[in-house]
């Protein structure tokens, strides 16, 4: 499947761009309440195109030459509803029924939005849903905060006792291995419309592993546009795909800025929809961009290491070790299969996919080493 767009103002068309298919592999576990709503549907990965006033899509039902296939005429914003095309040898192949093109407007920039993320203070009345999302971080920052500031190693260790004192093991109490808390832009900071998500928060018992992803949305964005991309992902996940909230627990842009993803509190074990089969007892971190052939920035890689050092440290997990997870069902491990997984893994380790892209996947070894170093191991 390929897409090209026409830039607003210049009228110039982009080259044809491939979009990642089978995007629901990032979704909820098969038997979860989120998957059972009946709202979820198959989709491609979202593609960031910036300000555009025209779009064309072409779809190959099976392997063939894209130059021999006419673009699918979407007809309207709702897109086409499928059809037939000629495959190899002149055979007719049917396109999926109900195909449509969703155009996602990320909305206007939030006040103070810049390359450094949204800055305080934020004005305006908070809705009940916005208050609930913000209150989930009340142990870390005041209600309505747009960012959670970083802490020193000592401050983080003291906070760990405050957050999880009675749950800490004797070893954690004696010598807690946890990385300094990094700065995180909150949902209010990137301008989340809290009316789009389900009202309640869903938690898992603890966080034993982190799965690293890429959004496969392209790399043609500036860091000042990152909040817009995240608002787009959020709307796409909830309105187009029928998920309860954005799927990822955290997102990281190319400048190394970390953003809160799914609502429920950054220090809490929020259950995401990022690695089908392994959303329980894990957290999902998505680096914004496509990293199959392009290397991720050093700032982004460092941010993933800092984030995992802190988040995994809250639960006493060693980034350089392995842990046991039980599959809830997927295309790589059958439901109920116990799997030894690296504490910091790529999406492809839990599901048969190219995510997080070969170039980012190769960086995970250094992420593990740096995260362990940040934890003081």
Language model features: what each stretch is:
Residues 225-233:
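Short Gly/aromatic-enriched secondary-structure transition segments
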Residues 5-73:
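Beta-sandwich interaction modules
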Residues 244-246:
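Carboxylate/His-rich catalytic cores and anion/metal-binding grooves
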Residues 8-9, 253-255:
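Short acidic-glycine loop/turn motifs at beta-strand connectors
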Residues 221-223:
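Short, conserved charged micro-motifs
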Residues 79-215, 219, 254-269, 273, ...:
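Basic/polar, cationic surfaces and motifs that engage anionic cell-wall
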């Amino acid at each position: 499947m390929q897409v090209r767009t026409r830039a607003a103002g210049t009228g110039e068309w982009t080259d044809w761009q491939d979009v990642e298919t089978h995007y629901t592999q990032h979704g909820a576990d098969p038997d979860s309440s989120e998957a059972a709503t009946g709202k979820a549907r198959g989709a491609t990965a979202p593609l960031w195109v910036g300000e555009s006033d025209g779009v064309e899509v072409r779809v190959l039902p099976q392997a063939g030459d894209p130059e021999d296939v006419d673009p699918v005429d979407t007809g309207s914003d709702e897109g086409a509803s499928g059809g037939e095309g000629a495959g190899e040898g002149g055979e007719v192949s049917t396109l999926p029924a109900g195909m449509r093109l969703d155009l996602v407007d990320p909305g206007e920039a939030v006040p103070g939005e810049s390359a450094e993320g949204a800055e305080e203070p934020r004005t305006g009345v908070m809705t009940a849903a916005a208050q609930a999302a913000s209150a989930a971080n009340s142990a870390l920052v005041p209600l309505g905060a747009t960012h959670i500031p970083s802490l020193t190693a000592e401050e983080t260790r003291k906070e760990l006792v405050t957050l999880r004192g009675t749950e800490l093991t004797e070893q954690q109490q004696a010598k807690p291995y946890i990385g300094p808390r990094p700065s995180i832009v909150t949902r209010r900071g990137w301008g989340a419309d809290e009316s789009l998500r389900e009202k309640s928060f869903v938690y898992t018992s603890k966080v034993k592993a982190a799965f690293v992803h890429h959004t496969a949305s392209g790399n043609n964005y500036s860091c000042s546009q990152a909040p817009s991309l995240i608002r787009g992902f959020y709307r796409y996940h909830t309105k187009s795909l029928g998920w309860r909230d954005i799927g990822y627990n955290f997102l990281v842009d190319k400048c190394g800025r970390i953003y809160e993803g799914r609502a429920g509190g950054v220090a809490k074990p929020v259950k995401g929809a990022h690695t089908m089969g392994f959303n329980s007892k894990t957290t999902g971190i998505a680096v914004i961009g496509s990293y199959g052939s392009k290397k991720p920035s050093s700032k982004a890689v460092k941010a993933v290491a800092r984030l995992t050092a802190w988040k995994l440290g809250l639960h006493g997990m060693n980034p350089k070790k392995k842990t046991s997870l039980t599959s809830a069902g997927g295309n790589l491990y059958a439901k109920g299969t116990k799997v030894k997984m690296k504490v910091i893994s790529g999406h492809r380790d839990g599901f048969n996919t190219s995510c997080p892209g070969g170039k980012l996947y190769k960086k995970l070894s250094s992420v593990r080493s740096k995260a362990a170093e940040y934890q003081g191991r």
